[in-house]
A protein has these predicted regions:
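Secretory targeting and sorting signals
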Residues: 1-27
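Beta-strand-enriched cores of mature, soluble protein domains
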Residues: 26-164
Length: 164
């Protein structure tokens, strides 16, 4: 009886071993990414040009559009007593060269760091797109700053693509 049990266990381990290797291969498939964003602001403080560069497997460069979907506190109320505010931002990145677009969702905590400057940080999720990026999935951190006096803003998104 013990002999049969040992043989059965050994057989089960042999059958399940490839599943462990497959899980390890999937975990090893996550790839780091960096997106560097540059924004030129108009006289009203709104973006007039938004460009980016990125590391592989994303496209090397392109343009993007941010849409603010929610703010807390509400825009009319301004920042809360701590000087902070939260933005939920949907970004659509369009690759130069026609490789497609990819989408991101960001939850940014902004802080006024001077009379004309804001710094922000928060999580970013990469959520599919078109063309080469249909199955794109990833996560990371967005950090950035706005200098209204200079009319510029920059951002850096870093993280891992877990499926593409």
């Amino acid at each position: 009886m013990k002999r049969f049990s040992l043989v059965a266990v050994a057989g089960a381990v042999a059958l399940l071993a490839p599943l462990g290797a497959a899980a390890s291969a999937q975990a090893a498939a996550s790839v780091p990414f960096t997106i560097n964003e540059q924004i030129t602001l108009g006289p009203d403080g709104q973006p007039v040009l938004q460009t980016f560069t990125a590391t592989r497997p994303l496209c090397p460069e392109g343009t993007y559009v941010d849409t603010v979907q929610a703010t807390q506190p509400a825009r009319a109320q301004g920042p809360d007593h701590s000087g902070q505010f939260t933005l939920i931002v949907r970004s659509v990145y369009t690759c130069d060269g026609g490789r497609g677009t990819f989408n991101a969702l960001k939850e940014l905590i902004g802080t006024f760091s001077g009379p004309d400057t804001v710094t922000a940080t928060g999580p970013i999720q990469l959520l599919g797109g078109t063309g080469a990026f249909t199955d794109l999935r990833g996560h990371g951190v967005d950090t950035g700053s706005i200098d209204f006096a200079a009319g510029t803003a920059t951002g850096t998104d870093t993280g891992f693509i877990v499926r593409s």
